[in-house]
Structures are given as C-alpha cells and as structure tokens.
Amino acid sequence: TFASLERRRRTLPDVKLCISTNGLALPQAVDSLVELGVDHVTITLNAIDAHVSAQIYDWVYFDGQRLRGKEAAQALIDQQMEGLQKLIENGVLVKVNSVLIPGINDAHLPSVSEAIRSSGAFLHNIMPLIAKPEHGTFFGLNGQREPDQQELAHIRELCGSSMTQMSHCQQCRAD
C-alpha cells in the first residue's frame, strides 16, 4: 500500500490520495499516511462495544497473535478509535463505513454514530449487509438476512440526529 501511494504521489502529484481500511493497523500507519499526503481515510467500523463486535468478527490477527472473541473485538475497536483520533489530529478527513447487520448491530449503530462524531469523523456511511450465499461470505453461508430498505432508512434516520449520514451509497462490494 505504501509503495503504491508513494508512486502515485510522485507520478500524479495533484491527485487526492485516499484509502479505505478496517483500522486494525491504523494507529501505526497514520504518520506514514500523512507523510505520503493521504488526506482522506475511510474506516470500516461496525461496533464500538466488544460484545457486539465479537458477533461480527470471530478473530483478528494482531500484534503477532490470533485473538478471539471479546479480546479480539476490543483490540480491533481500540485500534480503530485510536487511529481515527490520530488521523483527525493530523488534519485528515475521516469517513466511517458501518455495515448494518440485522439482529447484531442494528440497535448499536446510533452509539457508533455518536462516538465517531465525538471523535471528529465528518461522515457516516451505513451500508446494508450483503449476505447472499453465492458470495461465499460467513454471514451469507450461515443464513444471516440482509436488511430491507425500510430498516436501512430507519437506522440512517436515527443516526442522522447525531452524525451526517451518507445516503447516496448503493449496495456494492467496493467497501
């Protein structure tokens, strides 16, 4: 990633550099990203509570160890929030993507919106879970239903009271 960003910066100096990340290694990367001229980062952050996050992520590989359950979830959340804060302190625009997973993080997303607003993120993009079995994802293969349009609109409305929402995003696999 860093080599690609450096090449782009050298060959296309006027192009805005932005990246998207799950945030697990973000705090350690912020200084390099800022030095390379990255001025916009999107962090996928689906929960700020380890109990909720542990239902989304079975494990993370962090600091040379495979962590599981709430320990994994808390490590991911801590890294995401620390990275978000460091980016803001360095003048980088931060957008947060959250995937709406019915029955798992739907009631929790307003708390996510409040936390990221308090940390300085400028935009929250709540996207519907893509859980079609043919995509081969964990949730798709295990029968997790996707949110319907009414659920998505309702959560975006709830979260919109504390944080600017991005509502023009269409369902895709890009984020």
Model-based region annotation:
Residues 110-175:
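Auxiliary Fe-S-binding modules of radical SAM enzymes
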Residues 1-127:
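Conserved AdoMet/S-adenosylmethionine-binding subsite of the radical SAM
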